[in-house]
Amino acid sequence: MISISVIAQKPQKLSSNQIYEKIQKLNFIGSALYIAAHPDDENTRLIAYLSNAIKARTGYLSLTRGDGGQNLIGPEIRELLGVIRTQELLAARNIDGGSQFFTRAND
């Protein structure tokens, strides 16, 4: 007897408000890509405005992950700092409604 288990990603359960917002975005044809060198260079206010008020498909391209920066509040440096800043950016995009993109450039 062979047993096979398949693990798949569960579909998101969206609230009625989230579904309504996604439908509203279908009525706008346009997109915006905000590009900056470091994770802390983004203008979250602009990204949120374009994504939520204008209903544009909005993204932020961070050329680096911020692993070359300074960390005044913790011991993380280099790659570990890049991991923290990456998670911060992903959390910010969940709040402001934009998409997050990265390049492979080193800081």
Which residue stretches match the model-derived regions?
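Active-site rim/loop-helix segments in enzyme catalytic domains that contact anionic ligands
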Residues: 9-107
